[in-house]
Amino acid sequence: MKDKVLLGHGSGGALMADLLKNVIFAAFPDVQPTDGAVADVPAGMRLVFTTDSFVVKPLFFPGGDIGRLAINGTVNDLAMMGAEPALISCGLIIEEGFALDDLRRICASMSRAAMEAGARIVTGDTKVVGYGEADSIFINTSGIGYAQPVYGFSPDRVKAGDVIIVNGGLGEHGMAVMAGRLGVSFAPELPSDSAPLWPQVKALLGAGIVPGVMRDITRGGLGSVAAELAEGLPLDYHLWEACLPVDARVVKACDIWGFDPLYVASEGRFLLSVGPAQVEEALRLLGPAAASIGKVSAGSGRVFLHTTVGGVRPVRPLPGEMLPRIC
């Protein structure tokens, strides 16, 4: 059992000390063996704090794994608040019998993702539960970032006439996880879109483009996100189906498995609203995969999809769970 996680690895004794030294601290060199981490808030900045938990299945999927997802998910929540990611905590709940090699692989992936995002994993916790009391491994990450006080992105800052933009192809993470779960593959491979969003947000803000709202397109996909943003406001969101950037492999997978691409999750995509004069520059900064997908008008909190065949259909929040455990 030397290659497996044992209950003793969570006991606080010699086995746990060995696990921390040879697996956790080896992957996260900024973690100190103390009860927490201490940091200063840069002068003139606001502290932004967020937390998220990850239970994705399978743990490893095309283009990513639960470790990369756990870092990017929290980093992206900070980015949507206009905050540069700085400090991350990592909480691991591990099932007895979990392979140590897989744990090392996950921790190494988290370390790489944090470095890519410019953040540091500085504190954490590890618990081991009995066999059958969890499903392999669950991860919680909390993050602290720093934002300029002038930024305050909110649905009520969106204005009639604003243009809706997404930064890349929709639904790729959800379909990559589904493919991994079913053991099928695409040619060429369809990887998860999991990625840190801060570099793109930083580029926008640095160019003086301050969106009315930003929201990462995760569970519930674009449809649910747009419906949530519009709800209760004197605005309507109009989405143009012909403009939605959806990879042909995502379309094919959705056709086969009975999903609507409008509601499939991404993990490296976000929606933003900008004024008409800033659209061209925003698209340039976001890169060639970005697309202008709709507009905002005066209305009553509704979302409409203008279809490729000339119809218009309402877009409502996803009523239930279409694809469970995708993050």
Question: Which residue ranges define each predicted feature?
Answer:
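Extreme N-terminal starter segment of soluble prokaryotic enzymes
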Residues: M1-V5
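Glycine-rich phosphate/pyrophosphate-binding loop regions near the starts of catalytic domains
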Residues: L6, A14-V166, E172, V177
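Active-site-proximal betaalpha loop/short-helix elements
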Residues: A14, E95-G97, L190-S266
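Short Gly/Ser/Thr- and Asp/Glu-enriched loop/turn motifs at secondary-structure junctions
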Residues: P33-T34, V264-R269
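Aromatic/hydrophobic pocket-lining residues that form π-stacking "cages" and hydrophobic walls in ligand
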Residues: T74, M110, A226, V250, ...
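Active-site glycine-rich loop that binds ribose-phosphate moieties when present
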Residues: N140-F153, S185-G206
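Helix N-cap motif at beta-to-alpha junctions
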Residues: S273-V279
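Acidic, Ser/Thr/Pro-rich beta/coil linker or hinge segments at domain junctions
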Residues: L286-C327
